[in-house]
Amino acid sequence: MDSDGVSHAPSVAQSAPSWNPALRHEKDHAPAATAKLPSQVKPESSSEEESEEEEEEEDDDEDDEEEEDSDEDDDEEENAPAATAVSGPTPIAVLDGAQDSEDESESPSELTKSTPIVQASQGSMEKRVEVIGAEEEALVNAAQALNISGNPATGQTKAESTDEAESDEDSEEEESSDEEAAAAGEHQADNYEHQGEATALEEAVNESVRVPLVDDAAPESDDWGDSGDPFEIGGLQQDPSLQTPHAEAAGTTVGDDVIGNTTVGGNAGDDLDWGNTEEEDFFGVVANKPVESVEPAQPTQSPGAHVVQAQDAAPAKSEWDLDLDLDEDFLPDNEDGPVIELSDDEGFLDDEPTAPVEQPASTGIGGASRYAPQAAQTSHSVASPYAAPGQFANPPQGSMTRSITTPAGGVYNGYGQNVAYQQQQAARPTMPTSAQSYADKSKGGYASPYDLPDDVVTTRKRTTPRPVISATQPAIPPPRTSSMSSSSAPPRPLPPSNASVASLSPPPSGHSMQGQMTGFPPAVPPKSAPPAKAPSSDFFAELPVTSKPKPPGRYTPQPAAAAQSPSLQGPPQFTQKERTASWSSLRNEVLPDTVGAQPHLRQPEQLPMFPSQPSVPTRQNSLPIPQSTAPPPSSRYSPAPPSVPANNARYSPAPPTAQGGANSRYSPAPPGSQGAAHARYVSEPPTGPARTPSQTYAPRTSSPLAFHSTPHHQENTTNVSEQQLPGHHVTQSADGVPRAPFRSPLEGVSEALELDSTSSDRPPTTARSDTPPPTRSSTSSAIGSPRKKGNYTPQYQPMNPMAPSRSLSQSPATGMKQPGPMYGAAPIAASYGTHIQEATTTNSIPHRRQASLNYECIVPEDERAVDPLQRYKGHPVFAWGLGGTIVTTFPKQIPRYGGGMTAPMVKCSPGEIKIQSVKEIIPLAEDLAKFPGPLKAKSKKKDVLSWLTKRLESLELQIKDPNTEHTLSVDELKRLEEKTLLLKLLQFLVENDGRLEGEAANAAFKNLFSPEADNASDAEGSFSTAADIVGRSRSNTVNTPAEPIDARAIEDLQKMLARGEREKAVWHAVDQRLWGHAMLLSSTLSKDIWKQVVQEFVRNEVKKVGRSNQALAVLYEVFAGNHEDCIDELVPASARAGFQMVSTDGAGAALNAQQGLDKWRETIALILNNRSEGDVSALLSLGKLLSQYGRVEAAHICFILGRSVAHVSGVDDALADLVLIGIDHKQHPTELGVDLEPILLTEVYEFALSLSAQVNSHIMPHLQNYKLAHAYQLAEHGYRTEAQAYCDAIAAAMKATTRTSPYYNLSFIASLDDLSKRLSQSPKDSSSSWISKPSMDRVSTSLMSKFNSFIAGEDDGPSSNAATGTEVGPFAKITGDSPGLTPSHSNADLYADCFCKFKICSFKYIRTKDVIRATEIALRAAGQTFYGVERQPPPQPQLSPPSQRTQAKMQSYSPLRAEHNVSQPSYGNPYMPTPPNEETASASSFGGYQPQQGTGHSFDDPAPPTSSFDEPSYQPYNPDADDMEEDNKPKKKSIMDDDDDDLVARAAALKIGSGSNSKSDADKKADEAFRKAAEADAKRDKENAAKKAGGGWLSGWFKKDPNAAPGPIKAKLGEESSFYYDPDLGKWVNKKGGSSEPERATATPPPPKGPPMGARSASGGMPPPSGPPPSGAGLMKPPTSAPLRSSSMPPPMGLPGSRSSTPGLPSDNEGGPKPPTLARPSFGAASGPPSRPGTGMSNASSIDDLLGAPQARKGAGAKKKKGGRYVDVFPQGQAS
């Protein structure tokens, strides 16, 4: 169209199917698809036709087109005085001759610039005008048809406002068009560039065989929604009727470089006027056509840039549609992909700054001229998600309104390039004056005025029917667009008209809110932006040259997509005036309005598939664009929701950004995308289409799908959150894709932030209801009773470091609802969503991760190259070491440079291996590490007090710290103070030995709970300053004057009493407020009446006097005995139920129900200082109340004070009031044991109670489990010694009580035993080696002594044996002290060899069956029982079953420990109690398993006893084998053996000899005489041997050899003369022995290897009563039950206290048959057993004997003779 208003579109008739969606839509919707363009249309006729078209359009889409037409008509009238004002959208019609004459001057230049296609001479302007008029009519018809299909509502906006805006814009556009025309006239040829190949745009404009304009009949009405593409969906319903770009927008200089005034379609005629007049924009005219009804068609209207073509075609809508048949491919492409907003840039629409954008009235998108800026809409205009906001028209308004010039491609030009983006990128010249020739703009590629509409059309095509959206009430985007995250979001109102002078010019990129690139006049005055738009010399210069493929699909990124990306996302919503030309420079950061308009339709941002094609250039502007209003976060994908509040979107369809993610067909923007959407374009300048790749590697985030993982809720966060995240805050990939805010890999995810994203809408939890938080198990209710959820004042914030670690424990909202971190304190912000929001709202550039220097690794040439784990690249290694050590190693990366390499390559090699202590790497808190636990004895009292004092000091310092008030909430401060009180109470409890009674206790209570009591009287006396009365509640005394006493009331009372109605008299006194009478009378009645009277008194006389008397009221209730209900005086039941407390007396505002809670200290002080019966129950009730409100520390103080009624138990006990001090087990049951401090405080409480215990220490069974957890943590942090001490303390506690506890279950015992084993086998804290380093000074002393005690034992002689019997034994000492000496069970080994042939493995592996078999074999092999009675096979099998049971028990725990550790039961759980108390010491180490081996072997050869000790892990005692040989060879007896045997034989002879007369008295005397001599010799030898043995185990061994030689000789001598076989005894007896040395039997050095072991196993297990006397007789009996027990029960547990009753473990007693089994029936006479075995048995019965016995045995064993003598006695006796 010329500036005169004449439109020249000769090529329009020839153009291929119109690329204009509006036209195409007309085709689709037009009833007649074959409408033909009238060959000639006179201006008059055009006006008439326009009027007709207006009428038709009014019928179809009156609202939309009326608005547009009215706007354009106004513009045309203003721009073309000669032209008849078209009342309807007819402005496209042929202009009058006057207009022609006026515009011709400008048109030539413009036509040459913009449309080379139009080649008619300027002289024939009139002819062109006629043709153009016809085309315009056709366009008008098409537009009308489009408007018919469009939503009529779009034109609802009043035409007056649009007309005003259009008039202003027209005036401006005319000026610009005149200038452009002049410029074009001067250098038309220069500006024109011939393109060898016709572009899609040209084909769309020019008729071609492939896409004939007229031949191809389009459906009468295009169903843009049929495709299902966002393009179709886009804004058809939502978009208000597109207001035809008025002359305001005419001459759009799209970036002045991009499209400028270029006539799309290739019309080159200079006479073509592109919007200089009111009709500048075809769409303006078309859109205004519905306004025809408002204004008569004016054929003379100056056509807008688009209108130029439409004017000629106006005669027939259908024909025009056919003539302008949109390229079928082109339109579908637009549908497929978001239309690139090739909106006429400033150049196109702005060419004619016909009227400055001043039409605020046109705020309504529909009614107002599209170009008329609408103030309300500027900030709020919601971009239609379905249509890209056109610069020339509001995309929401109807796609049909698109100017003819807009290609169907919409924002994308025929080359698939995003014109809108280009336009934005190019700084727009001032809209009013810029009128560059289209030729200039086509240097990058020829672009005609049609090209510009092409950009615009794309969006409109989809949005054909667009509802009119008033700025105030943006239309809700149609839900159908998947791209729109929130269909419900109100459309953004058009930007205010005042935005720029060129109101009609398409909004510059600066007006991101408007769809500037759509080609439609933005609702906002586009001209202001044009100046900002840097003129680009070539329209296509910025776009990468590509084949002009139409966008394959709305989603297919176009080369211009990158450019479009800014358009996709509008800059932060600004009023148009806010947007300045300067913003155009930020076009990369600003999204064109198309974003809002076409979120649904717009083609996804052209993100390069590879970094080589980054869609977004690196941000050039570091500063984020100010976000006066959040820009619609048009995501790079059409569906991206507008980042700005949807309601601000210029186009109604714009979805709210928050929801956009969810609804958008594209993956949701990154979490920060709320702001990211705009952020990407605003803060992150999108790269130009030609952006060169900046990265060689394309991050996965560049993929649109990379953001699917982003939760939609983040986008759904409030608009605040969107605004909070300015685009510049969001990091972007090379492609410009917004990334989630960078987080360090080690950075912990802030729960508060995540909660905020989901719950930013949620009101801050700080609002507290008076209802206490519900217990964790209870469901929350609206009422918020203590069990119901509600925000309540005592919200517990774990932020308080001193508070229990559990976070949110007291927060009613967070603690109950939010899954806040259960362990560890959560940041306060986590509790309160508002804090999070505030943090996010702040404009702060987040840390941008620096480019990491990750170089490629040199790939090895061997098989390592195919390693799927790529270990050759090196990886850090971390491992936990022994004894709390950490082993780490990090690979070394050595850079290697090569020729031609820009960056070095790295070769990894193993790094240094570091061994560090956990204490250094992960140190345990000092206060926890220095805790003096375990607290076993009273000696720890001082240490405990010291620890509590330090803890209190740290708390007090924290309270005094001025920062504490700022970092902690009021509730947290209260809890911190209460925690201090709790520690003080515990400190006093320890100091006072656990007693809370007495004067000291009363004084302490006064100091703790009423420190101000002493000063209270002084303070009450007078108030020197106003500050003194602060905090004092107002007294209501004035309102409750004392009532006078009524004499008649007294008389009535007397009468009632006279009648005997005492109760009635009481209530009468109450009614008359005769409280004294009432209480006196009620005291004589039942307790219930007394309570009720007191309640009434408190309610009427105490509480009403003042609001601070709750504590006194509670005390009175306590006196009355209302222990349960007294707490109602602090917090009424109604308040606990969640009801608001209102002042009934009207004296003040509503009461704070929790105000009474703060009176708990006063209440406790009153109760404790005025003790009454049952007041502890009141303390318990108060504690429960405080616990309900999360005041854990205060509640536990009450429980401690009322400990007599408080129930302390485990968390599984529903009735438990206290589990661990300092933590609420009801609301946070799973947190118990996680934080050590509550465990330590509870240990202190237990210790304090134990101080007051008269008998045993006070033990809390449930606490032992937590102690074990404490031990584990200590072990984990490298405190092995302390952990081991805890294990021992727990074991002792279990054995200390005879009462069984469910907490001592199998799982607990197994865990304890497992930890104990680990600790015993791990190195000590001082050394990391397996064996602790011995100090040099002890090498000669300590080491040798240990060897002596460990290997040999120092018991050569009977005296030494006796001594050893009382000692604990080497095993207990060595095993406990030196974990490195694992073979502590070597004792057993020393004697096990005798039976080792049967015992293949340690008892752990030998099951009872094996033992039985072995014993039986041994018995058979022996063919005789050594020591006769003692070893009988029968007992063995009998014992085996019980042993199996016991063994099974023991095995499960720690079978091995017995081996090395005598002190600890190795097999039986060391902690399992063993019933026999006597032998616990002895059995503890070996007894656990002795039953198995002992039971089987104890009666067999001496070997079984050895086996009872399990196979010797340290050193099997070979002498056992020798002993076996000795058994076979009785001759090998030493004198000592003979002596021992003699002693035993003499004892037996004394018992039996009296009855036996086998020999004569003379013989006896001779034998005795001879025997005495022999004994004397033997005694001397024995003494010498003992002396030698005393030297050490080595000496014992050496001594053994010398003894061996004389031994046999002496034994033979003695045997020959004195020994005889006694059939009664069944053994050989020494006649001479008599009772000569009976005492030596008791002092027998070592118990016999075989029998002693058996005896030991048997006797060790059996209780002392069952134990046999030193003589062997007793041995037979003991085996019954004793051995079984010893074997089954771990020795330490052997004590009855820890007896087998431990849960889960069958007691040894279970095997009832065991005693009979153990009983040795074969022994016959109890006295019969040989004396030596008897003594051995007796010695073995105790732990000391076991320990000592092995030592003695060791010595004896070292001497084989000793071992042999025991064995030899029998064979020799038998032989003899």
Curated annotation (Swiss-Prot):
Residues 111-124, 144-158, 394-406, 415-439, 612-627, 692-704, 716-734, 1445-1454, 1477-1496 have a biased composition (Polar residues). Residues 522-533, 629-644, 1662-1671 have a biased composition (Pro residues). Residues 557-573, 761-782, 1652-1661 have a biased composition (Low complexity). Its main location: endoplasmic reticulum. Residues 1-129, 143-277, 292-817, 1428-1776 are annotated as: Disordered. Keywords: Autophagy, Endoplasmic reticulum, ER-Golgi transport, Membrane, Protein transport, Transport. The keyword DNA-binding does not apply. It holds the Pfam family TPR_Sec16. It is found in: Endoplasmic reticulum membrane. One of its GO terms (cellular component) is endoplasmic reticulum exit site. The keyword Magnesium does not apply. It is a peripheral membrane protein. Residues 187-196, 1560-1586 have a biased composition (Basic and acidic residues). Disulfide bonds: none annotated. Residues 46-79, 162-181, 217-226, 321-353 have a biased composition (Acidic residues). InterPro entries: Sec16_CCD, Sec16_Sec23-bd. GO terms for biological process: autophagy; Golgi organization; intracellular transport; protein localization to endoplasmic reticulum exit site; protein transport; vesicle-mediated transport. Belongs to the SEC16 family. PANTHER family: RGPR-RELATED (PTHR13402), SECRETORY 16, ISOFORM I (PTHR13402:SF6). This is COPII coat assembly protein SEC16. It comes from Phaeosphaeria nodorum (strain SN15 / ATCC MYA-4574 / FGSC 10173). The gene is SEC16.
